[in-house]
Structure formats: C-alpha cells, structure tokens
C-alpha cells in the first residue's frame, strides 16, 4: 500500500504543522492581551495632549510656529510608516503598504517627492526592494516599544520638517478596532490641522505662558509627536497580535479539516486494497 504510506506521511506532516500553528495561536493570544492593555493605557495621554494642542492653537491664532504654519507649495512630504517585524499576521502589512502606495502614487502624480521613516522589518524590506527613499528606520522593536528606539528615527524626519526640508509629515499605521478588525490609517502630523482639533474639542481655555508661548509650544509639539508615534506603534502591535491570533486559528482549523479529508482518503484507499485482496483470494480459491 504505497498510496496508504504516502497518505499517512501527509497526515503526520499536517499534524506537525497544526501543533505549530496552535502553539503560535496561544502565544499570540497571550501577547494580544498585553499589547491591548498597553495600547489602551497610552490612549488617555495621547487624547489629552491633542486636547491641549487644540486649545493652544485656538487661543493663539496669530502666533506663527512651524508646526502650525502651512507651506504655500508642497514639494516634499515625509511619511512615518509603521509595519511589523514578523509575518504570519494575515494581510495586516499588505493593507498598510497598499494604503501607503496609493498616497505615494498620488503625490508622485503631483510631482511631490516622498521621504520615509520606517518602523518594522516588513515595511523596510518592501520599500528597499522598490528603491524608495528611506531616510531612517528602526527594526526588531520587540514586543514592548521603547521610546528611546522610536524617538531617534522619528526625530530625524521631524527635524527635516522643522528645518523646511519637507513640507508635510504623515503617519501610516494599522488602527486597532477590535480583535477581528484592524484597518490602515493615514494621519497628517505636521502641520497640525487646527480646524480638525478645534472641531474635536469645541470649547477652549485661556493660558498664561511662562516664559513665553513659543517655548511652551516647542516642548508641547515635541511631546505631541512623541505620543502620536508611540500610540501608533502600540496600536500596530495590538493589531499585529490580533491578526496573528486570527490567522493562526484559521490555519489550525484548516489543518484539522485537511487531516479529516486525508483520513477519509486513507480509509477509502485501505478499504479498496482490502476489497481487492479478498477478491483475489476468492478468485484463487474458485480456480482451485
């Protein structure tokens, strides 16, 4: 029964794969809870600093700051692209990259150049294959994002904006909606869209600034950008673990179905072989 041996070998192979995918599912489930807790704990700070930025922008409409001023002509944009270091997380990276490519094509049609700061090995590898301009990057971020590892690459492209080398700064990442759903998001970081902030927080406060409004805004903008980048990376990590858990569960279920089909095929082949042997025995006995 050469066919039977081949089927048994396939069954063992699929069972081994199923053990791996089940283990990866369990690990992803554990990590998913931790990343979601980290993401949710970071949200209040990010929301509060956005609120403060809205109030400061509204109470100082005549103050000129690079983070608030729109450039007359946009010749170059910067993009912070957040992806994962590892695969096996469904279409998470593919969707984020597809969204980035759509924006990049739109900018290219307008003659706008694109500089990219990339977080995550998957995005970095994809962009280098396409010879896109990656001005800074950070990979192997681990399961817990460290501010020190994020600030270096991000500060490089932020400084380029403040120095006038780029005219807009955007961030692309995977927004965590729930365990089953994550979607790519594109947000403009600089210049700040004050009208959106003001509509989000319609009331205002009056502030007294020490020593002056520019000094406060310089620090506030830096903290704002740090919180946005950290929040985006945290959201992306929560999305990664959720997508990986779902993908590994689907792989485990598919493996179980494949094993059942192979067992059925094996039993049919074995039954056919036994029937053939019995027929040959009966035919031999009749001939005698």
UniProtKB/Swiss-Prot annotation:
InterPro entries on file: ATP_synth_F1_ATPase_gsu (IPR035968), ATP_synth_F1_gsu (IPR000131), ATP_synth_F1_gsu_CS (IPR023632)
Membrane topology qualifier: Peripheral membrane protein
CDD domains assigned to the protein according to its UniProt record, in alphabetical order: F1-ATPase_gamma
Keyword Transcription among UniProt keywords: no
Keyword Membrane listed: yes
Entries under PROSITE patterns matching the protein: ATPASE_GAMMA
Major location (coarse): membrane
GO cellular component labels: plasma membrane; proton-transporting ATP synthase complex
GO molecular-function terms, A-Z: ATP binding; proton-transporting ATP synthase activity, rotational mechanism
Location within or outside the cell: Cell inner membrane
Keywords: ATP synthesis, Cell inner membrane, Cell membrane, CF(1), Hydrogen ion transport, Ion transport, Membrane, Transport
One Pfam match: ATP-synt
One record GO biological process: proton motive force-driven plasma membrane ATP synthesis
Family assignment from sequence similarity: Belongs to the ATPase gamma chain family.
Subunit structure as annotated in this protein's UniProt entry: F-type ATPases have 2 components, CF(1) - the catalytic core - and CF(0) - the membrane proton channel. CF(1) has five subunits: alpha(3), beta(3), gamma(1), delta(1), epsilon(1). CF(0) has three main subunits: a, b and c.
Entries under NCBIfam families matching the protein: ATPsyn_F1gamma, PRK05621.1-1
Function: Produces ATP from ADP in the presence of a proton gradient across the membrane. The gamma chain is believed to be important in regulating ATPase activity and the flow of protons through the CF(0) complex.
The protein's name in its UniProt record: ATP synthase gamma chain
Name of encoding gene: atpG
């Amino acid at each position: 029964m050469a066919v039977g041996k081949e089927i048994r070998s396939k069954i063992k192979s699929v069972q081994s794969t199923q053990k791996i995918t089940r283990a990866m599912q369990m690990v992803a489930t554990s990590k998913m809870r931790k990343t979601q807790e980290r993401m949710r704990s970071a949200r209040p700070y990010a929301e509060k600093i956005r609120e403060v930025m809205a109030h400061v922008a509204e109470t100082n409409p005549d103050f000129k700051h690079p983070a608030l001023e729109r450039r007359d002509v946009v010749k170059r944009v910067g993009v912070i692209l957040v992806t994962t270091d590892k695969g096996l997380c469904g279409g998470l990276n593919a969707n984020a990259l597809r969204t980035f490519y759509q924006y990049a094509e739109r900018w290219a049609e307008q003659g706008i150049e694109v500089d990219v700061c990339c977080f995550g090995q998957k995005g970095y590898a994809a962009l280098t294959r396409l010879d896109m301009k990656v001005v800074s990057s950070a990979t192997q971020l681990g399961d817990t994002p460290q501010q020190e590892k994020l600030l270096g690459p991000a500060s490089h492209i932020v400084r380029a904006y403040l120095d006038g080398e780029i005219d807009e700064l955007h961030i692309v990442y995977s927004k965590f909606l729930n365990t089953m759903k994550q979607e790519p998001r594109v947000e403009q970081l600089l210049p700040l869209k004050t009208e959106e902030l003001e509509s989000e927080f319609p009331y205002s406060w009056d502030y007294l600034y020490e020593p002056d409004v520019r000094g406060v805004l310089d620090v506030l903008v830096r903290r704002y950008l740090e919180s946005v980048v950290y929040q985006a990376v945290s959201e992306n990590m929560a999305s990664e673990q959720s997508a990986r858990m779902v993908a590994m569960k689907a792989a485990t279920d598919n493996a179980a179905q494949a094993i059942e089909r192979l067992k059925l095929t094996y039993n049919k082949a074995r039954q056919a072989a036994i029937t053939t042997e019995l027929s040959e025995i009966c035919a031999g006995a009749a001939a005698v």
